Structures are given as C-alpha cells and as structure tokens.
C-alpha cells in the first residue's frame, strides 16, 4: 500500500536543547484513520504542521502524494490535498461571510466563481450548514465556526484530513454532530485528540508522540 504522507527521520527543535521531534518516521495510507496521541506540548501540532509545510523540519524528509516535498511550491500542492483543520477555528476563518470562507479554497485552486459557488452550496448542504451561508463568520458560535472550518477544508476536496483537536470545547450536540460527519467521510485522517470517544469511534490505528519519538 502506497502512503499518502510519509515522514522519514524528521527532527525539529525550537531551541537546540529541547527537540520536539527526534527522528520521527510516520506513514498515512489511503483510508487509514490514525490517532496521534500525546501529552500537551509533546509536539503533535508541530508534526501536523510539518506534514503540510507550515514548519520545515531541521532534518528528515517529507514525502506526500507521490513525491518528496521540499520547497514552498511543493507544499502549496500538499495543502490542497491534505486539509488541515486548525485547533482554533479563528486561525482558519478570515473572510467576512461563511460563503466567502468556504469559497476561498476552491477559488485559490482555480475554480471559477460559478464553480466555487456550486461547491459552497453543495458542501454546506452536505454538512447541514446551508442556513449559515450568508452569516458573518466572526459572529458565529464556537461550535458553528468549527463546523464551518471543516466545510472550508472539505470544499477543497482533499485526499487526507489532518484534524487538530476537532471536538475541543464543543457542546455535546455539536460534538456528536461533528463525529457523525467525520465518521461518514472517505478521506484518510490523522486525528489529534484527547477525546477518548472520538478515538474509539473514528480511528483504525493509534500512535503516541513522547520525548520526540513516535511509537
């Protein structure tokens, strides 16, 4: 089975004395749903960011979607194929309205305005978010923002999803709704979560990051 994302010997440190990642090897195959576990501050978010080029490792190689990725131009393509759901929805949503936030990715991928509009409608309908289409994004609740963030990621039709604490700080109805949505998606996933139910219901494999090493 070929990997969608494959890390080889990845190391990174924000200061020389304390490596966050130390020779990490990791592979995500098609259809896999991998839980990335570890204590707060262990480097889980850093590892997700390495996968999509938001952080460049000091050593090691990043292979994604068939080839090694090194330059920013390489990772622009990766970020279109591996949708990263940020831990804080406010880091992801920056357009005035929900429709504009969801259309942003497809437009950047070269879709016409008409095509992007169709994608927005289809994606919001699919997630049950059509009533939010013309809402001002910053006025939404935290749970609504989280769902709109997922819609913005899915609108790019990624092959993989990298989910950073997807259910964090959600009320129970929104949390359950999000889990149902994720359970029905076909994409491979890496899920960072401390939510035991999310892990038990969604993942096919678990790995743990501790002291810079992945086991």
Task: Enumerate the predicted regions with their spans.
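The feature captures the beta-strand-to-loop junction immediately N-terminal to the Walker
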Residues: 37-39
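Helix-to-loop junction immediately C-terminal to a conserved catalytic motif
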Residues: 52
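Conserved ABC ATPase signature
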Residues: 136-140, 144
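Conserved ABC transporter NBD signature motif
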Residues: 60-70, 78
């Amino acid at each position: 089975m070929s990997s969608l994302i494959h890390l080889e010997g990845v190391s990174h440190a924000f200061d020389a004395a304390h490596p966050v990642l130390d020779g990490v090897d990791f592979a995500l195959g098609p259809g896999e749903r991998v839980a990335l576990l570890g204590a707060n501050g262990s480097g889980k978010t850093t590892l997700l960011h390495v996968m999509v080029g938001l952080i460049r490792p000091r050593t090691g190689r990043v292979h994604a979607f068939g080839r090694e990725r090194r330059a920013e131009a390489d990772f622009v393509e990766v970020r279109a194929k591996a949708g990263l759901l940020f831990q804080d929805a406010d880091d992801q949503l920056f357009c005035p309205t929900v429709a504009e936030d969801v259309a942003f990715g497809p437009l950047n991928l070269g879709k016409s305005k008409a095509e992007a509009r169709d994608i927005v409608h289809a994606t919001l309908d699919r997630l049950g978010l059509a009533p939010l289409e013309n809402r001002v994004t910053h006025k939404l609740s935290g749970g609504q923002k989280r769902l709109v963030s997922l819609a913005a990621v899915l609108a790019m039709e990624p092959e993989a999803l990298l989910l950073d604490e997807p259910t964090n700080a959600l009320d129970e109805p929104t949390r359950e709704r999000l889990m149902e949505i994720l359970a029905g998606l076909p994409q491979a996933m890496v899920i960072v979560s401390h939510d035991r139910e999310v892990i038990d219901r969604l993942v096919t494999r678990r790995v743990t990051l501790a002291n810079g090493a992945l086991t």
